[in-house]
Amino acid sequence: MQRSPLEKASVVSKLFFSWTRPILKKGYRQRLELSDIYQIPSADSADNLSEKLEREWDRELASKKNPKLINALRRCFFWRFMFYGIFLYLGEVTKAVQPLLLGRIIASYDPDNKEERSIAIYLGIGLCLLFIVRTLLLHPAIFGLHHIGMQMRIAMFSLIYKKTLKLSSRVLDKISIGQLVSLLSNNLNKFDEGLALAHFVWIAPLQVALLMGLIWELLQASAFCGLGFLIVLALFQAGLGRMMMKYRDQRAGKINERLVITSEMIENIQSVKAYCWEEAMEKMIENLRQTELKLTRKAAYVRYFNSSAFFFSGFFVVFLSVLPYALIKGIVLRKIFTTISFCIVLRMAVTRQFPWAVQTWYDSLGAINKIQDFLQKQEYKTLEYNLTTTEVVMENVTAFWEEGFGELFEKAKQNNNNRETSNGDDSLFFSNFSLLGTPVLKDINFKIERGQLLAVAGSTGAGKTSLLMMIMGELEPSEGKIKHSGRISFCSQFSWIMPGTIKENIIFGVSYDEYRYRSVIKACQLEEDISKFAEKDNIVLGEGGITLSGGQRARISLARAVYKDADLYLLDSPFGYLDVLTEKEIFESCVCKLMANKTRILVTSKMEHLKKADKILILHEGSSYFYGTFSELQNLRPDFSSKLMGCDSFDQFSAERRNSILTETLRRFSLEGDAPVSWTETKKQPFKQTGEFGEKRKNSILNPINSIRKFSIVQKTPLQMNGIEEDSDEPFERRVSLVPDSEQGEAILPRISVISTGPMLQARRRQSVLNLMTQSVNQGQNIHRKTTASTRKVSLAPQANLTELDIYSRRLSQETGLEISEEINEEDLKECFFDDMESIPAVTTWNTYLRYITVHKSLIFVLIWCLVIFLAEVAASLVVLWLLGNTPLQDKGNSTHSRNNSYAVIITSTSSYYVFYIYVGVADTLLAMGFFRGLPLVHTLITVSKILHNKMLHSVLQAPMSTLNTLKAGGILNRFSKDIAILDDLLPLTIFDFIQLLLIVIGAIAVVAVLQPYIFVATVPVIVAFIMLRAYFLQTSQQLKQLESEGRSPIFTHLVTSLKGLWTLRAFGRQPYFETLFHKALNLHTANWFLYLSTLRWFQMRIEMIFVIFFIAVTFISILTTGEGEGRVGIILTLAMNIMSTLQWAVNSSIDVDSLMRSVSRVFKFIDMPTEGKPTKSTKPYKNGQLSKLMIIENSHVKKDDIWPSGGQMTVKDLTAKYTEGGNAILENISFSISPGQRVGLLGRTGSGKSTLLSAFLRLLNTEGEIQIDGVSWDSITLQQWRKAFGVIPQKVFIFSGTFRKNLDPYEQWSDQEIWKVADEVGLRSVIEQFPGKLDFVLVDGGCVLSHGHKQLMCLARSVLSKAKILLLDEPSAHLDPVTYQIIRRTLKQAFADCTVILCEHRIEAMLECQQFLVIEENKVRQYDSIQKLLNERSLFQQAISPSDRVKLFPHRNSSKCKSKPQIAALKEETEEEVQDTRL
């Protein structure tokens, strides 16, 4: 960034904003880059502002019991705020004084007042000087107030972020990510531009008092008729506003429903295509859109009448003010024109400025109170540590996640002790206490010495992660003691990657040690992966590490934990995404050797890990089931395997027992409560703890079903922040509505507006921040994975010796603290955060306007209708002026002289009542035409919006994955949220306002041209100057606005990234580092926003200066050319003032239209996306001689012998796959064939391309080569027909918001009996029956009430219903509880017994049921053989399989002389050694 010219600018340059000229010139000539933007003044830096406000807030907290944030803000900003307010008031006063001088100028032309004629020229000079003074006062004042508003926003942004990093996990569990984003976006945006309006709460009443005094002097009591009308009008507008709010609140729920479904569709677009659900999703979203648009139209009509009322009120205010006076004393032209000028100012003060100011104060105080409540929430308490401690001790520790349960626990325990029970057994106490709430950890004891490895095991929900959280201080123990040194390193269960390079992710702000870094890289098996990237470890990873495989992310997270020098290393299931060989190598080299002298706590379920551990702790339902060594475990707890894995062999249970297990599993994985809430219920969640969900928590204590909920790290659908134009797995907008929260939707929507957290099962059932932190980012990454993704190759060579690691291990054990580095590479920050600028022009092209107008045929006729009405209005205005100009002057006392062909100054009441009749008739006509001329326009523009939305939706659903892979999910969602909201709400009325203002200006110019041709000559160059200035400014302003919009993304991205990794941040003590990063992101945004505000003020000031020059010319031309006794000067000066103020408004409105039309350009860009390919080859003869097109009919999911596919035979020839056109090949020359009904397992290391191959089968990638199913080539049929041949269980489970029935059968092809039959078959019946409404129960939020296992069963049921002959399974057992895993295995054997199954899996047990194995290595097929051959050869499979698995496969190999074919059967009862959760 460049140094700002503002620093060296002179006072004059600052006053006229001339220092912005270089950036305006550059923006006009070329495209602006981030490097062209000026640095912010030091006074605006986030560091300075946040420190200033934080100091005052701390002072407020320390000095008062009831601290007020507004007091802290007042001490920081009040005096500057009032200073600019006084300037603003003085500028407004000049508006009130101008009509006085105008009246004196008109009066000087009264034939009876000749002595004033000589001072007319001086009055003209005075009038012009007032305009100059107003310009010099108003613009610096408005800019100064905007500047203060910006500083307040920055300071509060920073304060909220710092507080977020300090919040306790219990508080985070109650706050949704939507609420946090809402706090930052909706509430704080009110300060940016609203602060300039705040002063009108006192300026407007003073202005009205001054104006009424001046009008009283002119018209006496009749002045109050006009004021009365304005007050009635303001009340009418307030009523319309309330009505509009009612419609908008109703519509918010509908918009939310549509956006929830749309975001689910976008993030799961690969699954939608795989299931062939494009038409179903399109129809579903269009139906929701239809109901939404009905309310949109109602709200638009109300807003239209509100806007029209303002435009046409001016006519009647003047009429009602002058009428009573004129009837009594006659018409005085001087007074009419002066009154018109006064009423223009009065109308603005009463109907616009004051109501807006009141609304601004109401919104701002509400926002400040919300932030104040947030800033007083409970903070995370760091435990008291003793740095000299070498051991880790936990004594009698009990803990609850639910806030308040700890206090209840203490009271209950105290009561229990008071009873003095004779047996002294605590079991009675705990069983009674379960009614209040089950502790997540109960009476835990262990002690480990320095350098020991403690393995923690247990089934899902046993409390393993909670134990680590308690050691880190995230979970506060209700009783008991924890003792350790406090120097902790942590590796999360779900890998967390921050935006930045691989190196920055591993070093994580700690000072760099080359030897240490290289040793860690080697131990974590990252050397080979890093070598694949051109930039090596300096490659920039996007948010969530989207370009990496799950295994690569897991190893980077582990490397980060190991790189930090700590006394205690907490490793929470770090090997979940690794193949068995990599896991084994890392466990040996890293955990056992590299960290040999460090204390380690490893959460695991692997038998080999337990054997190597010094101590083992097995948790069961929060209690310590066993603590000791492995040999003690085998002797004392022979049943430990079932506790370790969660259940016994599922197949051995009766149907009733299975159902009870499923029911219990459902309860454990659900969140509390069972009362359904209507789909449209969308309530704003308050931040106060006494809110709705707070009450439900209190009630839940008495509900035994709710109280058994434990804190369990359950894999739910991943969540992320995408409306922020950043990509990851899942945009957070699914939980968050993007409905505008105020009329200024254009300002709010780009900042990710939030109105509610979406429809939910219950208030508690939403995605809290805590859920966000405990969710995996690893699911379904193949849809996004770029060609740069590393592909690890399977190395069969022995590993190098680890002597270097031995050396480093000793270095790591030394008590040397490393320095913390806070340096941040700003270039990397920009690269991480800023997208490439959109490929649409800086200024909207004429082609876009033309295309927009022609979307709907009737729009052209509506525009012609508006023009006809306008011509009628101009004609009516000329009639009124003709009446005023040609009514003869009659004096009551003397009628001997009259002046023909002249403009009379006085008209008596007795002779000219007919003037008023005509005037009233014309006024009524204007009102009727004015009110209703815009309605057809608004109606038609909303219809255009509907058409564009439907076209865009169709284009996205039909676009190829190669195109969608290049787009970010947040970017797509923004088109459907922000841009469609602009097309619905802002664009129709902005276009109406612009057309209205333009026609008013043209009409006024036409009237002036008739009266005074000289003025018309002066008007032409002014209009040309306006157009040229607009074109010059627009080029730069639109680019700056775009840069500012893009600069907003990193702020919210960084917030969500920080929340996802909050436990890691705290464990590493990196809060200051991330605060610095956040301030950098804020400063980047501030630089763009400040420059935009400055250039906007430059433009507004130049427009004002042109107007002043024009008015000076008009004033002197009028004064010097008007003859004696003529009142024409009044009409000319009044119209000139009206022309220029309206023209300024029109120019600004045209800029708004151009800015909003960029949304239309973006929508058109999406509409023009390519569609998925159609068949390219002609139909080929089938094997039996018939034409393939006769065999290939639309698969109606009915099994008949003559319908393709019948057998499921599959032949693959020379298959090559790429993610994007022209990209690197992910798979090359893959060839193999599968017999009907055969089961094939895909083998390969993490990132080798197994999931990619499954995507290629479905034609979701750019592919070359050929695949045939039962002899039919994929080139000879449609994509829909081809994909319907497959049943799919994807890695990323897709549950959209809708009923169970809709989720299983979106096309509504099957009866309830058939759906229930399939549900029973896959074990879903008992799950569905638990919910009210059963099949009609509405699932929301990605099916958050279901466990990951139940979601997998839903996918399985879909595949059974599809009756497909080929089944593709992509790691179906990932994150499954053992119960669901057993169900899936059983269903595959029963329901798909005669189907071809292609399985990509990490569990060996599942792979053993495959007859053939396809080994993928270095993008190619390395082996394709049966189990027997792979076991005999040196292969990946041979290395992964254990001796016990071989015995299971070939039980008779040693006893039988004759080798028979192996029988693939279900696993029998598992022994202790076989229960391991081994992964390939």
From Swiss-Prot:
Spans traversing the lipid bilayer: 78-98, 123-146, 196-216, 223-243, 299-319, 340-358, 859-879, 919-939, 991-1011, 1014-1034, 1096-1116, 1131-1151
All residue ranges annotated as the ABC transporter domain in the record: 423-646, 1210-1443
SUPFAM superfamilies membership: ABC transporter transmembrane region, P-loop containing nucleoside triphosphate hydrolases
Broadest EC class assigned to this enzyme: isomerase
Region Interaction with GORASP2, residue ranges: 1386-1480
Motif position, PDZ-binding: 1478-1480
Modified residues (Phosphothreonine): 717
GO BP term (any one): bicarbonate transport
Post-translational modification: N-glycosylated. Phosphorylated; cAMP treatment promotes phosphorylation and activates the channel. Dephosphorylation decreases the ATPase activity (in vitro). Phosphorylation at PKA sites activates the channel. Phosphorylation at PKC sites enhances the response to phosphorylation by PKA. Phosphorylated by AMPK; this inhibits channel activity.
Cross-link Glycyl lysine isopeptide (Lys-Gly) (interchain with G-Cter in ubiquitin) mapped to chain: 688
Residues exposed to the Extracellular side: 99-122, 217-222, 320-339, 880-918, 1012-1013, 1117-1130
Its membrane topology: Multi-pass membrane protein
InterPro entries: AAA+_ATPase, ABC1_TM_dom, ABC1_TM_sf, ABC_transporter-like_ATP-bd, ABC_transporter-like_CS, ABC_transporter_C-like, CFTR/ABCC7, CFTR1_ATP-bd_dom1
Record domain ABC transmembrane type-1: where: 81-365, 859-1155
Glycosylation sites: 894, 900
Alphabetical keyword list: ATP-binding, Cell membrane, Chloride, Chloride channel, Endoplasmic reticulum, Endosome, Glycoprotein, Ion channel, Ion transport, Isomerase, Isopeptide bond, Lipoprotein, Membrane, Nucleotide-binding, Nucleus, Palmitate, Phosphoprotein, Repeat, Transmembrane, Transmembrane helix, Transport, Ubl conjugation
Cellular component terms (Gene Ontology): apical plasma membrane; chloride channel complex; cytosol; early endosome; early endosome membrane; endoplasmic reticulum membrane; membrane; nucleus
Residues engaged in binding ATP 2: 1219, 1244-1251
Disordered as annotated region, ranges: 1452-1480
EC number assigned by the record: 5.6.1.6
Biased composition regions of type Acidic residues, renumbered to the chain: 1470-1480
Cytoplasmic side: 1-77, 147-195, 244-298, 359-858, 940-990, 1035-1095, 1152-1480
Family the UniProt entry places it in: Belongs to the ABC transporter superfamily. ABCC family. CFTR transporter (TC 3.A.1.202) subfamily.
UniProt xrefs under PANTHER family: ATP-BINDING CASSETTE SUB-FAMILY C (PTHR24223), CYSTIC FIBROSIS TRANSMEMBRANE CONDUCTANCE REGULATOR (PTHR24223:SF19)
Record's protein name: Cystic fibrosis transmembrane conductance regulator
Gene (name only): CFTR
